[in-house]
Amino acid sequence: RIAYLLYAQKGKISSKDILIISPNKVFADYISNVLPELGETTVPETSMEQILSTVLDNKYKFQNFFGQVSELLEKPAPDFIERIQYKASFEFVSRLDKFILHMENHYFRATDVKLTKYITIPAEFVGEQFKRFHRYPIRQRFETMADYILEMMKIQYNLTVTTAEKNLLRKEIKNMFSGNNDLQIYKDFFEWAGKPEMFKMRKNRMLEYADMAPLAYLHLALDGNKTQTHIRHLLIDEMQDYSPIQYKVIQKLYPCRKTILGDASQSVNPYGSSTAAMIQKAFTTGEVMKLCKSYRSTFEITSLAQKIQANNELEPIMRHGEQPEILPFKNAEEE
């Protein structure tokens, strides 16, 4: 797909304009062997963990994806599974969006601000400016509000404001908002949703992997999108291993065209995975294409796989090989 894009749009798009999101480097290493033939350098690659950590300014320690998978395999606690399932649901995304609106209406408490010895800015006027700039993300409003209020003071009182007074006003306005700590408002969300048990901090203040995307989503909603406009095409590998809330974060960061590849039956995390239909719902637009012809395996291997998990749409190619053997073992050591 990348080779096709570079060939078909030569001169319009180059390898540096494309980004791969992949859980491992095998995919990118394979691609890097193909691209030199097209006169291109390696395509930049990142992971979901890197993206989420960067959005959150690398503030938090967190369990990575493979740590989550390992825990599910070795000690799958029911409450851990329940937390993953809840945060991978569309209901969860909907509740987060409603909570962001709740913060808009309840987390800002305007108060009087004594700007100078003789001038006090009334709380009502401050509150009006918070609503005036409602198109801005909440945390982006504070500086704009302060500048506007000072401009009004200058017009009304012919006032020359010092830098110290300007900084004081910005600080006062920021402190009127009780959602300046991302982690605290994330905890508030679960209390507000009536599901406090759905958030659990691990030892050494480590976050679970499933908490990184919703925390990043809240951060982007309050701080504004850090849109990556230099990326012109995004390619996501192993699509089945990402949840709807992760795709919502991706959509905020990368508004470009995307190619999303994967196989829903190959998910290594059945509790937080996505099907093609779920991904289409998360993005609201896009075309789903199913590639049903299997070139990877012989007819015999594909037939065995069909006995384990049937897929009526799969079309094996008539390339024959040895019949796979099933070898029984009595214990793990023997195996």
Segments and roles (model prediction):
Residues 1-11:
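Walker A/P-loop NTP-binding motif
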Residues 11, 16, 25-53, 57-67, ...:
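Conserved helicase motor core of SF1/SF2 NTP-dependent helicases
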Residues 20:
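Conserved SAM-binding loop
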Residues 52-108:
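Charged, amphipathic alpha-helical linkers/stalks
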Residues 86-87, 91-97, 101-233, 243-247:
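Conserved helicase NTPase catalytic core signature
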